[in-house]
Amino acid sequence: SEEWDKVRGEASPYGNAWDFRTNREGLLRYWGDALKERGRYENMITIGMRGERDSALLGEGSPVEDNVTLLKEIITAQRGLIRSLEQEGLVRENAPQMLAVYKEVEEYYYGNEKISGLYQWDGLDGVICMLSDDNFGHLRTLPTSRMREHKGGYGMYYHLDYHGSPVSYEWVESTPFSQVWEQMTEAWDY
């Protein structure tokens, strides 16, 4: 992220690597300082992690199982940090927490034949899971009947413009209002 680029470095108290395996303490310190600064305000706390520059967490081609295991470790540490700061009065009590199920982590959310994904994991109880569109204004998924049992509920991330590879469309009315209405009505009615 742009914010991480401003604070990272060899001499930084947060370290240089956006990698939980090699820079766990630095990232927890970074997230903790952000929570201490902003946690008493009315806001939603995002949890989870993607790779640098919105990439896959452990890189392209890495096994889903390894990514799911690491993401569970990250979320467990983040939720522990939030609870700890909440007890100290540095984070608003019961502030909502949200996991964004972007395309980079969607496979880890659902899992595969070798590992259950995050959506069946009780470590996300009480967390809002924000599903995402396909970057072009089309819903990727809606919660199944089993997913609807999730304690925390769901939200929807919807692009009206997009900045990213392979194409960017920004500040241009590129998603017709009729499509926005149709897609968001489908999500609402579901």
Which residues does each predicted region cover?
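Intrinsically disordered, low-complexity regions enriched in small/polar residues
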Residues: 6, 16, 104, 110-112, ...
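Catalytic domains of carbohydrate-active enzymes, especially glycoside hydrolases
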Residues: 1, 37-43, 183-189
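Glycine- and acidic
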Residues: 12-16, 56-65, 161-173
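Hydrophobic or amphipathic alpha-helical targeting/insertion segments
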Residues: 1-38
